[in-house]
Amino acid sequence: MVAGLRDFTLRTEDGSGKPVLDESNGEELMHVQTSVAVALGNRPIESPGTLYITSRKLIWLSDVDMAKGYAVDFLSISLHAVSRDPEAYSSPCIYTQIEVEEDEDDESDSESTEVLDLSKIREMRLVPSDSTQLETLFDVFCECAELNPEPVQEEEEESGHNWVFSADQMDVRGGDDDAEWQISQSPTSVIGHSNGDEGLNQPMLELQINDQRFEDAEEMVHESETKDH
């Protein structure tokens, strides 16, 4: 079952305003970033708060309203990316896509309605006041995402066809003519990481087949036919 985005108001009673973690089950605080505003779906950006990144989830707590806060498990985050494109959003931010439970009977878009249903929110943007911290946040996101791998379905294990692989497992010799694959960063302002099967709105990596090897093969066939005649 997908947990999705949810309310979070559990704060410690020592006056620090920090969130209560599930330490008994091994949850640890990994990073704290102050002065981070949040925008849910297409709704207006909210007043700044503090972002707490734990080994299990993201927690955003408002600095203005002590009774307001949001949380989402890393297992529910299908994609996170650094966005600096002003056409995509007005401020540099961490963009996230959140998995939600599909409800065929509910055709309304809760992201744009007055009544906020957090369980239907599919996108969340985290906007730090200091945009130079985006890379640090992205690195922490990646680290915590690796701590929460998506459970492997039994059918996938039995089928033996796992087509997921990393760039480190591929030949990335872009300068060699005989390289089978050439991997180049797509010329966009987004750096992305996907934790699931969701498609990216913009291509993060561009895989290109080096067609030179086919041209060489055609030349060899042509030379062979010439010698035979």
From Swiss-Prot:
Name listed for the protein in its UniProt record: Chloride conductance regulatory protein ICln
Organism, as annotated: Arabidopsis thaliana (Mouse-ear cress)
Subcellular location: Cytoplasm; Nucleus
Family stated for the protein in its record: Belongs to the pICln (TC 1.A.47) family.
InterPro entries: ICln (IPR003521), ICln/Lot5/Saf5 (IPR039924), PH-like_dom_sf (IPR011993)
Recorded GO CC terms: cytosol; methylosome; nucleus; pICln-Sm protein complex; plasma membrane
Source taxonomy: Eukaryota, Viridiplantae, Streptophyta, Embryophyta, Tracheophyta
Cysteines joined through disulfide linkages: none
A biological process from GO: cell volume homeostasis
Domain of life: Eukaryota
Function per UniProt: May participate in cellular volume control by activation of a swelling-induced chloride conductance pathway.
Subunit structure, as described in the record: Homooligomer.
Keywords annotated in UniProt: Cytoplasm, Nucleus
